[in-house]
């Protein structure tokens, strides 16, 4: 069987792509990503797990805004040398483009934090680069992933989603009329984490026909994707079997870095606890026991803000701490988890720590055979930015059934 020819834009470390590869139905012709650390990991994953002998060439580290060079090739001080995307696609007919621009400019939380509401952020218009690639290669379909906040983002005088809908329609693609229906709650697909994303499917009206495109898009959201819902998973389903990491009571060194907790036994890749201060360990124990013993003294925002001030001497407008509950999906795994992890405290008081890279990856549904390489900062960031592969696989299966099965 000939595989579905796909390219992945804004690929990150490949969460979206990994789910598609797991089905065995798709071939990744190219993946485009501008950050070095995700590219490094993506190349390793494509070669070691998915057995692409030419992974080095298929992963293009480049700035997608330089679209013409992306197509034709470049020789660049920062990004090195490549023959470009058109060379990789060659004579293949492209079936599918997947990916989504960075979501920070559309994120409601990001807009609240930024004094200008992210109106001046260049990332508001990265969808235009995605669109240029779609227009150039005319795939039968595309999947555009982003945060639900994109529906309300308005950097100029019009909502960004109106511009996106209009420009993709002008390019000859059919999208769902009411994109609120395109918001998907990933907990409904077995992802053990409270994470919702907008998944925009676009179909080439010239290829499928005007009326059939509309029917297929509606069928995708109303029938095909919902038919693949899975039982809900809790955080403990994902991380409960990992080796326990206990406070040592003193600092030690491991690989030249300071550690405050025991190493995993048996060893598990990427499962090393961050160094925690004695003060933080004490706070974590207090918060974890508060839940374990059903006291719930520190559930309210005010109580948590008061505790933070009492323990650190500083004031905060937002509460800093959150303990992951064993019997619920975890809170969102964000890209900024690399900063401190205080909102992702492990549920067990005996461990008194924030979650590890491997636990974040498990909550994002990456398989343990995806071994991440880089600093904690790089790894937490790329994992937090990813689409959970468990959902990606379901998405890939749904698209295959709807669009590609009879090809």
Language-model features, listed with the residues they occupy:
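Core alpha/beta nucleotide-donor-binding catalytic domains of modification enzymes
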Residues: 2-138, 148-159
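Short, flexible loop/turn elements at secondary-structure junctions
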Residues: 10, 36, 64, 101-102, ...
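Short alpha-helical patches at coil-to-helix transitions and adjacent helical residues
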Residues: 13, 161, 197, 385-389, ...
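A generic secondary-structure signal for well-formed alpha-helical elements
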Residues: 24, 46, 101, 151, ...
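Class I S-adenosyl-L-methionine
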Residues: 75-79, 84-91, 106-309
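Short, well-ordered beta-strand micro-motif
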Residues: 98, 199-203, 334
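Short, acidic Gly/Pro/Ser/Thr-rich loop/turn segments
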Residues: 104, 207-209, 338-343
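C-terminal target-recognition/interaction regions appended to catalytic cores
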Residues: 257-407
């Amino acid at each position: 069987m000939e595989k579905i020819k796909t390219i992945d834009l804004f690929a990150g470390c490949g969460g979206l792509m990994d789910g598609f590869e797991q089905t065995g139905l798709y071939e990744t012709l190219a993946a485009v990503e501008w950050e070095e650390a995700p590219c490094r990991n993506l190349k390793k994953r494509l070669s070691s797990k998915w057995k692409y002998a030419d992974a080095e060439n298929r992963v293009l580290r480049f700035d997608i805004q330089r679209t013409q060079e992306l197509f034709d090739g470049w020789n660049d001080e920062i990004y090195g040398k490549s023959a470009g995307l058109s060379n990789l696609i060659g004579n293949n007919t492209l079936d599918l483009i997947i990916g989504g621009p960075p979501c920070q400019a559309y994120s409601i939380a990001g807009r609240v934090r930024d004094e200008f509401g992210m109106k001046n952020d260049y990332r508001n218009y990265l969808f235009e680069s995605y669109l240029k690639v779609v227009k150039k290669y005319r795939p039968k379909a595309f999947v555009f992933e982003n945060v639900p906040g994109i529906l309300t983002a308005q950097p100029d005088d019009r909502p960004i989603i109106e511009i996106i809908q209009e420009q993709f329609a002008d390019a000859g693609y059919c999208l769902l009329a009411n994109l609120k229906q395109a918001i998907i709650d990933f907990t409904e697909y077995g992802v053990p984490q409270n994470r919702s994303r907008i998944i925009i499917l676009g179909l080439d009206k010239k290829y499928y026909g005007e009326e059939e495109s509309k029917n297929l898009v509606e069928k995708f959201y109303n029938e095909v994707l919902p038919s693949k819902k899975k039982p809900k998973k809790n955080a403990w389903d994902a991380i409960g079997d990992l080796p326990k990491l206990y406070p040592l009571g003193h600092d030690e060194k491991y690989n030249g870095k300071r550690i405050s907790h025991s190493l995993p036994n048996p060893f598990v890749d990427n499962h090393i606890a961050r160094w925690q201060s004695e003060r933080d360990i004490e706070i974590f124990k207090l918060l974890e026991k508060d839940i374990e013993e059903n006291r719930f003294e520190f559930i309210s925002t005010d109580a948590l803000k008061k505790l933070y001030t009492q323990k650190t001497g500083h004031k905060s407008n937002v509460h800093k701490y959150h303990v992951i509950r064993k019997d619920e999906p975890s809170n969102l795994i964000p890209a900024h988890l690399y900063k401190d992890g205080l909102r992702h405290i492990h549920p067990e008081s005996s461990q008194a720590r924030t979650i590890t890279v491997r636990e974040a990856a498990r909550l994002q549904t990456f398989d343990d055979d995806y071994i991440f390489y880089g600093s904690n900062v790089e790894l937490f960031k790329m994992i937090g930015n990813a689409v959970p592969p468990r959902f990606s696989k379901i998405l890939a299966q749904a698209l295959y059934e709807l669009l590609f099965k009879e090809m």
